[in-house]
Curated annotation (Swiss-Prot):
This is Large ribosomal subunit protein bL25. SUPFAM superfamilies: Ribosomal protein L25-like. Belongs to the bacterial ribosomal protein bL25 family. CTC subfamily. This is one of the proteins that binds to the 5S RNA in the ribosome where it forms part of the central protuberance. One of its GO terms (biological process) is translation. Keywords: Ribonucleoprotein, Ribosomal protein, RNA-binding, rRNA-binding. GO terms for molecular function: 5S rRNA binding; structural constituent of ribosome. Part of the 50S ribosomal subunit; part of the 5S rRNA/L5/L18/L25 subcomplex. Contacts the 5S rRNA. Binds to the 5S rRNA independently of L5 and L18. Pfam families: Ribosomal_L25p, Ribosomal_TL5_C. InterPro entries: Rbsml_bL25/Gln-tRNA_synth_N (IPR020056), Ribosomal_bL25/Gln-tRNA_synth (IPR011035), Ribosomal_bL25_b-dom (IPR020057), Ribosomal_bL25_C (IPR037121), Ribosomal_bL25_long (IPR001021), Ribosomal_L25_dom (IPR029751), Ribosomal_uL5_bac-type (IPR020930). One of its GO terms (cellular component) is cytosolic large ribosomal subunit.
Length: 179
């Protein structure tokens, strides 16, 4: 989980009014709780999400209580790229969740030295397990791969408490020659 919690403030204002004051409107929801309409300071939210995956785990402090959340959906303005709304799902550490997480390929630099590249066919894997054990992303090292090698679901390692729901034989990427 993230080390510091981002502050959320309950809101009654309409989203447009919230945005005009430098905040991002959002909603926090979860199993067995009423949804809470909130607002986040735009700069602090962007800083908290910087370099994180779309489905990042983040601590949110609202009404004096810290909640562990997965980022559900981030809506962006198509012209400015600014975040205009965010939804966050509260989860307990032991709650079993099913979600898609992004894939990363480590060691691509070693491939490029040999004029090879990773050609990804898919960008995420579907996992299930306790929310505390779901990684922000799944990675595979491709540094030692050769031309024509395939990367399958089975090549990705996850915690023993987490299951990958995709077929282990599914080809995720291939190693090809750089153009």
């Amino acid at each position: 989980m993230s080390e510091t919690a981002i502050q959320a403030v309950e809101r009654k204002e309409k989203p447009k009014e919230v945005r005009s004051k430098g905040f991002v409107p959002g909603v926090i929801y979860g199993k067995g709780m009423d949804s809470i309409s909130v607002k986040f300071d735009e700069k602090r939210l962007n800083k908290a999400l910087q370099g994180r995956s779309q489905k990042a785990k983040i601590s949110v402090q609202v009404a004096g209580e810290t909640k562990q959340c997965f980022v559900g959906e981030i809506q962006k303005d198509i012209t400015s790229g600014k975040t205009i709304h965010i939804s966050m799902q509260v989860v307990e550490d032991d709650q079993v969740v099913k979600m898609k997480v992004p894939i990363t390929f480590g060691g691509s630099e070693a491939l490029s030295e040999r004029k090879l590249i990773v050609l990804p066919y898919f960008s995420e894997l579907e996992l299930t397990g306790p929310s505390a054990d779901i990684p922000e992303y799944v990675a595979v090292d491709v540094a030692d791969k050769s031309l024509g090698d395939k990367i399958t679901v089975a090549d990705f390692m996850v915690s023993p408490s987490v299951s990958v729901l995709d077929d282990p034989e599914k080809i995720i990427a291939a190693i090809t020659g750089a153009r």
